[in-house]
Amino acid sequence: MWGNDRFVTAVDDLVIVGIACGPYMKRGDGHIKQEDLHWLRSTLKEKVKGGKRVVSFNHDPLMKDLDNYIDYVKVLEKYPIVAHVNGHYHKYEYYKGGDIDCMMVRSLDKKKGDYGYTIMDVTADSVLFYNKQLEKEPVKVNAFAIDTQITPIQETYNTTFNTPAGYSIEKIYTDSASIFPRL
C-alpha cells in the first residue's frame, strides 16, 4: 500500500503504524521480526509527541496466534494507543491484547457476494467500526471508548538458554528480507 511492508503516516492527531508479521517458515506461527520491532520502537519514539495517539495495524491478532505478541504489546503500551486492528480470522471481533483495545476486521471478500471493507472512525473519545459492503450503506459493527491508560503486560518469555561450555550465543539482526527467501 505504501510501498513497504512497514508503514507510518500521520492523520490529524493520530500516528498510524503497521508492520508485517510472518509466518516466515512454512506452516509456522505468525511472527514479528526483531528488526521490525526495532523499527517500531524508533518510529514511535520519533513520531509520537505533542498529544499524538497511536493506531496499530498488522495481520495477526495480539494473542498467541502471533508467537511474540508480548514483545509487540510491550512496545505499543509505552504510547497512548487508541487501538490495534488486525485481520486473520476475517470477522469482526473485539478483544484485548494485553490491556490494549483490539479489533479483528473482515476480509475484502468476507463471503460470496459480501464484498466490502471496514471503515474505522476515531473521535476524541471513541473508536467506531463500520462494515461497508459494496453498493450499500455502512453498518456499525462495534464501538468502544478510548482508554490510553494501559496496564503493562505481565506475561514473559523464558529467555535463558543452556549454552554448552566453550560456546556463546549472540543475537545478530541482519536479515532485511520480509519473507523467508528459500524453502
Regions found by a protein language model. Name each.
Residues 1-45, 49-50, 71-83, 93-106, ...:
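Extended active-site neighborhood of metal-dependent phosphoesterases/phosphodiesterases
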Residues 9, 93, 97-176:
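Binuclear metal-dependent phosphoesterase catalytic core
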Residues 21-22, 59-61, 108, 134:
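Active-site beta-loop-alpha junctions enriched in small/polar residues
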Residues 44-64:
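Short acidic, glycine-rich surface-loop motifs adjacent to enzyme active sites
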Residues 56-61, 82-92:
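Histidine-centered catalytic micro-motifs
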Residues 62-67, 110-112:
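Acidic-and-aromatic substrate-binding clefts and catalytic sites of carbohydrate-active enzymes
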Residues 67-71, 87:
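Short, conserved clusters of charged catalytic residues that mark active-site
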Residues 179-183:
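Aromatic/hydrophobic beta-strand junction motif of beta-rich domains
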